[in-house]
């Protein structure tokens, strides 16, 4: 069947269903809201699947269930149907003689996709399937659009993303992915709560977008006649709270970055960001190991994570190496001496086919080499540490080597999952780094940071030694659900306008 023929068939079915809805309206029974369910299908299966048929013959278990009709098999005076609710499916057995006059005839006109309410008693069929023997049946919502059952579910990827509501109806693995996402967020929240962290909310609209190097979304506040930005990170507000005495804080919320779309990037994404006073980046690496090990056990029942044909072990201690060490390890033809000099490092990048801007210093050149030759190869759980100060404007300089900072990023499967560091609490150093960021912005770097005078004022009051970290929830869920694209773990990912 061609796309045009499918479209014509769908319009025909919609017209037929509209006629049925018109008749329901005429009878005054369209869209009732007085049916009450007392149990979910998943609860019934959990409690009664193991019971033998004799149990139901001896015990009349009466239930009231509701859900979307997903299958329908009419056999003369009796029929079977399956309804889907949030927890799963349950089978209904419907007999003409068990229903009020006319109810069975009405049922035969109903369509797959309609939402039903049913009351009756439980029994087991000859094949052992838990079933409701229905004695009261109502149509609660008439579905006008047919479900794509003829095509064995919804398989077109773009349609799945655009019409997630249909995707969720048709595909149980998709529903399970988003249940897992909820469990991941709940576990992270519980993990931090148990360790004395306070959950807070900070502004989503900010006069100065800070806390990360990224291009922001801009908007205008009409009442105040001022430009505002959707936040790219909550970092500077959370650290203001540390200054104010909330020594362990976290936030799980959205960030917005006006950048490209890819299988790993969405302009709107979810992060957990947390800060702990009197801790350093080593403490947070230890905490991250504990969090991810416990999380994989909770969600998967194992510390073995299977992703896109590869297996990652979250049980053993994670690998830790510096940016420089990783470059040398993955580029045997590059020497440490070459990485110590800007011009020689630029020559290395040129040899590797990596384009550079004239404004890049040695630290930025390192990162360009790292991102192009190392990052994608970091398959096993790995902490990369000692990021150059040039690319870490909010991180504390390392005491032994001020060229780098006390910063780490966590990688698995060749992608960054987390970023953390000992926080820069030296007011003068932070002010100087802000000034350098402003210079880069004036030179054309749209992702460079703004100068945030109020944040500096907060630092002048004194921020205790602190470490902070952000973990990308979306990428973490991708990993734990074996999802190849970030769009697979976002209920409503951003899409180009429909043609």
From Swiss-Prot:
Catalytic activity: tRNA(Lys) + L-lysine + ATP = L-lysyl-tRNA(Lys) + AMP + diphosphate
Cofactor, how bound (note): Binds 3 Mg(2+) ions per subunit.
Binding site for Mg(2+) 1: 409, 416
InterPro entries the record matches: Aa-tRNA-synt_II, aa-tRNA-synth_II, aa-tRNA-synth_II/BPL/LPL, Lys-tRNA-ligase_II, Lys-tRNA-ligase_II_N, Lys-tRNA-synth_II_C, NA-bd_OB-fold, NA-bd_OB_tRNA
Required cofactor(s): Mg(2+)
GO molecular function per UniProt: ATP binding; lysine-tRNA ligase activity; magnesium ion binding; tRNA binding
Protein residues bound to Mg(2+) 2: 416
One Pfam family this sequence matches: tRNA_anti-codon
One GO cellular component term noted in the UniProt record for this chain: cytosol
Keywords of this entry: Aminoacyl-tRNA synthetase, ATP-binding, Cytoplasm, Ligase, Magnesium, Metal-binding, Nucleotide-binding, Protein biosynthesis
Major site of localization recorded for this protein: cytoplasm
Domain of life: Bacteria
SUPFAM superfamilies xrefs: Class II aaRS and biotin synthetases (SSF55681), Nucleic acid-binding proteins (SSF50249)
Compartmental location: Cytoplasm
Enzyme Commission code: 6.1.1.6
GO biological process, alphabetically ordered: lysyl-tRNA aminoacylation
Keyword Isomerase: no
Entries under Gene3D superfamilies matching the protein: Bira Bifunctional Protein, Domain 2, Nucleic acid-binding proteins
Signal peptide: none
Subunit structure: Homodimer.
Similarity comment: Belongs to the class-II aminoacyl-tRNA synthetase family.
Protein name: Lysine--tRNA ligase
Organism: Thioalkalivibrio sulfidiphilus (strain HL-EbGR7)
